[in-house]
């Protein structure tokens, strides 16, 4: 048999799969963390990300791991995000089983703010501004707007949950499985701070690869998830 004498089979390449067929992720967005420290990592982000993270610092946000009994708080954020963005949330039992199964190989991160502590921190920052600087009035007004926003918060709790992220760790990779945030708290820039915190935690575990996981594989600017992940 001489393959050269056979008629050429005609194949057509239909392109790579886009979207999330059957809920599966075809495209991954990965950042290499090797050779970074906390300072150089932050500098590696784009200007929009750095600005948002600095704003989160101004608000004195706290990022911490949720306790098992706080999983409903975590789930509520994901649920609200799903309603807003059009995806279906898991049930509470899913999160609890995942928490129990992965143990310290999973971080259920919550970003929150204590309004009064945040106001106190802003007061200190405002008092330390250089009044002789050309940017003084602009900087002062920006911090004052943050104070006004904090004062307007109507919360019965001393700490207000803003956003969350679930990070899964293996020996070689950290994966940002999913996350969410409350739309009314977007000014806090909590999702940006969560990603920075998660990457620092990844480096502390001596893991060099951070997987943002799914993107649609559509690069015409219409994929909002990709645009967010490209900030880092």
List each language-model region with its residue ranges.
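C-terminal catalytic domain of photolyase/cryptochrome flavoproteins
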Residues: 214-232
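Generic recognition of stable, solvent-exposed alpha-helical segments in well-folded globular domains
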Residues: 69, 190-193, 224-227
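A conserved beta-strand-loop-helix scaffold within acyl/acetyltransferase catalytic domains
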Residues: 6-187, 201, 218
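Active-site-proximal structural scaffolding
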Residues: 160, 188-191, 208, 222
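Hydrophobic alpha-helix feature that most strongly marks membrane-spanning transmembrane helices
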Residues: 198-199, 203, 207, 230
């Amino acid at each position: 048999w001489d393959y050269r004498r056979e008629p050429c089979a005609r194949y057509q390449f239909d392109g790579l799969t886009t979207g999330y067929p059957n809920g599966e992720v075809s495209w991954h967005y990965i950042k290499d963390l090797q050779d970074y420290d906390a300072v150089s990592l932050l500098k590696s982000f784009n200007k929009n990300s750095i600005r948002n993270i600095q704003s989160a610092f101004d608000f004195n946000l706290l990022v911490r791991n949720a306790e098992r009994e706080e999983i409903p708080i975590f789930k509520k954020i994901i649920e609200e995000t799903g309603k807003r963005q059009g995806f279906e949330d898991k049930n509470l039992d899913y999160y609890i089983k995942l928490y129990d199964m992965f143990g310290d190989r999973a971080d259920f991160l919550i970003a929150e703010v204590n309004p009064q502590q945040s106001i106190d921190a802003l007061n200190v920052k405002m008092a330390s501004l250089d009044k002789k600087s050309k940017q003084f009035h602009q900087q002062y007004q920006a911090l004052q707007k943050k104070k006004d926003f904090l004062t307007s918060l109507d919360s019965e709790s001393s700490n207000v949950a803003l956003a969350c992220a679930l990070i899964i760790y293996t020996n070689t990779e950290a994966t940002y499985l999913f996350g969410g945030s409350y739309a009314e708290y977007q000014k806090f820039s909590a999702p940006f701070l969560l990603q920075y915190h998660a990457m620092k935690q990844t480096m502390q575990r001596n893991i060099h690869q951070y997987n943002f996981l799914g993107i649609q594989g559509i690069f015409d600017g219409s994929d909002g998830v990709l645009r967010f992940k490209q900030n880092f």
